[in-house]
């Protein structure tokens, strides 16, 4: 039925065009942002999950930074304590050479040992990283944040701890660097006592190096694990919220065609009133 009051065809065409325009706007937004779900109204459940995962990954990034800083401190101490251990081992060799040596030769050995002791003191002082020295008389344990775990609303932060007493190389070599440890006047008995002191220091330094080596390995392993975890979480977030650009591009082309057809349909529907007017022309 033709009516001059209500154009049903035009109303239908208008509704179809409005729906197409809305879909087109949504598709254009997905293409411009690269996201299928960019806000809670798109999909509240997926948006909430993705938001929590992104937050966890930010925390993991902070943990990575802490691990990097901790690795620097441990690596520096590990390198230095091994140099100190090698120096003490050199002193051991010098002391063995001093057994039964002449006073003149002992004087030369004394000079060499003093030079090695100076190197030990230098290594102790320079084993510093970001204001932290794990060898030169540390007073507090090193705690490195290693992981961030969330279960519901409960959060747990795990740490890798290096005890100060296990890495205090200054105390380990104290009896060696003290003045008078070895002099050209030392007899074989005194040299034997000095060798016992050296052996004790070497054992302590080996334990300290093992402690730092274990911490170094643990930190490196955790850094690698955390890097993989971050990648997995990022992929998971992408699966939830990222738009498939191939599909969206194809959808955009189809909707643009639908929009053009909708405009034409509306134009045709509006022209129907002109045919009614022609009925009254002479």
Curated annotation (Swiss-Prot):
GO molecular function, one term: structural molecule activity
Inducing or repressing factors: Expressed at the onset of the exponential phase (after 4, 8 and 12 hours of culture) but not at later time points.
Annotated localization: Secreted; Bacterial flagellum
A single Gene Ontology CC term: extracellular region
Superkingdom of the source species: Bacteria
Keywords for the protein's UniProt record, in alphabetical order: Bacterial flagellum, Secreted
Main location: secreted
InterPro entries, alphabetized: Flagellin (IPR001492), Flagellin_C (IPR046358), Flagellin_N (IPR001029)
Phenotype upon loss of function: A fliC mutant is attenuated in a murine model of infection. As the infection progresses, the number of cfu per spleen from mice infected with the mutant is significantly lower than the number from mice infected with the wild-type.
Family classification: Belongs to the bacterial flagellin family.
Function: Flagellin is the subunit protein which polymerizes to form the filaments of bacterial flagella. The flagellum is required to cause a persistent disease in a murine model of infection.
PANTHER family in the cross-refs: FLAGELLIN (PTHR42792:SF2)
Protein name, UniProt field: Flagellin
Originating organism: Brucella melitensis biotype 1 (strain ATCC 23456 / CCUG 17765 / NCTC 10094 / 16M)
């Amino acid at each position: 039925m033709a009516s001059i009051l209500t154009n049903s065809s035009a109303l239908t065409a208008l509704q179809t065009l409005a729906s197409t325009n809305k879909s087109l706007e949504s598709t254009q937004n997905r293409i411009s942002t690269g996201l299928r779900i960019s806000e809670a109204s798109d999909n509240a459940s997926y948006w909430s999950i993705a938001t929590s995962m992104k937050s966890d990954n930010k925390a993991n990034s902070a943990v990575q930074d802490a691990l990097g800083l901790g690795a620097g401190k441990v690596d520096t101490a590990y390198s230095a304590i091994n140099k100190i251990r090698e120096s003490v081992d050199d002193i051991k060799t010098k002391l063995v050479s001093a057994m039964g040596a002449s006073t003149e030769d002992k004087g030369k050995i004394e000079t060499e040992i003093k030079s090695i002791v100076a190197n030990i003191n230098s290594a102790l002082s320079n084993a510093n990283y970001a204001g932290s020295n794990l060898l030169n008389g540390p007073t507090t344990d090193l705690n490195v944040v290693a992981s961030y775990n969330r279960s519901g609303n409960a959060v747990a932060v795990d740490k890798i701890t290096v005890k100060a007493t296990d890495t205090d190389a200054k105390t380990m070599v104290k009896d060696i660097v003290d003045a008078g440890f070895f002099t050209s006047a030392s007899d074989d008995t005194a040299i034997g006592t000095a060798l016992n002191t050296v052996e004790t220091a070497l054992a302590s330094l080996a334990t300290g190096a093992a402690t730092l080596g274990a911490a170094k390995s643990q930190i490196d392993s955790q850094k690698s694990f955390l890097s993989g975890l971050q990648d997995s979480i990022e992929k998971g977030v992408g699966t939830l919220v990222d738009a498939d650009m191939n599909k969206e591009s194809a959808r955009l082309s189809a909707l643009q065609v639908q929009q053009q057809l909708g405009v034409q349909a509306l134009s045709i529907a509006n022209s129907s009133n002109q045919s009614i007017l022609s009925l009254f022309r002479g």
